[in-house]
């Protein structure tokens, strides 16, 4: 059987899809169409009519999906869907997982007797680090020589809202067959990473000059200049802060507000950022979340509310 695959448009979503593709291929199945999805969710998600059997990973639940795996606490679009949801071997949700990639791997092994290649285990452990922000130090988090960091960066910046599915398809296919360390050396990955690397120093300088402190929270407006996104730069320059709020501009002229907590100095309040951003139709995890806006004015207003 051939399935349409819906996946979150980041490294975790792509890796989750790759593991599923390897599993499906072992049964003589595969993917038909590739659909990269992102937050905020369009209003028609609940009414979406799938034309083919569908798999969804690292994204919102939909009861019509044949397979669904996710680890986001904000996985259910409606209270009714959450109330009526039942865990099965085909539909599984566990917000305790740092990455959806690791969740998919574990469930396929346990419920379908999947025999994965050894490199999938290493992939899952690295996704726990990158998606769960559990690096051993700020130095490791900022080490762009690491293959996993380079892979993750290839989906960031101006590529975050990319509509061309070819790159996603290429990487999912490649990750399903070989180690992510080998995939990171592909010309397409390196081209994206090199573009990021060229702007790294100027981006660091921009962050150092433009980070604004509000007690234990830092704010940076990245929409005013074309800079590389540096998720941990605020904690690099100001290691004692608890939160960083980012305002970003995307290729489609939309804006987003991202909020993260310091992985090396967690705030005592333990505010759930993903749930907090649901008021703006966003989502995320305990320590990181994002919401999108049509205008900069709306994004700035939300950023100020978040900082308060």
Which residues does each PLM region occupy?
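Long, charge-rich alpha-helical interaction segments
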Residues: 152-191
């Amino acid at each position: 059987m051939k399935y349409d695959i819906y996946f979150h448009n980041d490294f975790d979503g792509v890796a989750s899809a790759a593991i599923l593709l390897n599993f499906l291929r072992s049964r003589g199945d595969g993917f038909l169409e590739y659909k990269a999805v992102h937050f905020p969710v369009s209003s028609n998600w609940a009414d979406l009519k799938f034309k083919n059997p569908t798999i969804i990973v690292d994204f919102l639940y939909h009861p019509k999906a044949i397979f669904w795996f996710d680890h986001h606490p904000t996985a259910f679009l409606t209270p009714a869907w959450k109330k009526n949801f039942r865990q099965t071997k085909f539909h599984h949700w566990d917000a305790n997982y740092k990455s959806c990639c690791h969740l998919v791997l574990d469930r396929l092994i346990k419920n379908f007797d999947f025999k994965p290649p050894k490199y999938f285990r290493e992939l899952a452990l690295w996704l726990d680090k990158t998606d769960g922000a559990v690096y051993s130090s700020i130095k490791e988090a900022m080490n762009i020589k690491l293959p996993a960091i380079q892979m993750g960066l290839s989906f960031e910046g101006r590529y975050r809202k990319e509509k061309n599915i070819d790159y996603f398809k290429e990487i999912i296919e490649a990750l399903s067959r070989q180690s992510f360390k080998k995939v990171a050396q592909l010309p397409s990955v390196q081209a994206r990473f090199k573009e990021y690397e060229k702007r790294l120093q100027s981006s660091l300088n921009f962050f150092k000059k433009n980070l604004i402190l509000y007690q234990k929270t830092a704010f940076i407006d990245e929409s005013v200049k074309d800079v590389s996104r540096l998720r941990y730069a605020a904690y690099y320059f100001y290691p004692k802060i608890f939160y960083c709020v980012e305002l970003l501009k995307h290729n489609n002229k939309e804006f987003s507000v991202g909020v993260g907590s310091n992985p090396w100095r967690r705030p005592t309040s333990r505010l759930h950022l993903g749930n907090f951003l649901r008021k703006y139709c966003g989502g995320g995890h305990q320590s990181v979340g994002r919401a999108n806006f049509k205008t900069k004015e709306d994004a700035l207003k939300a950023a100020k509310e978040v900082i308060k």
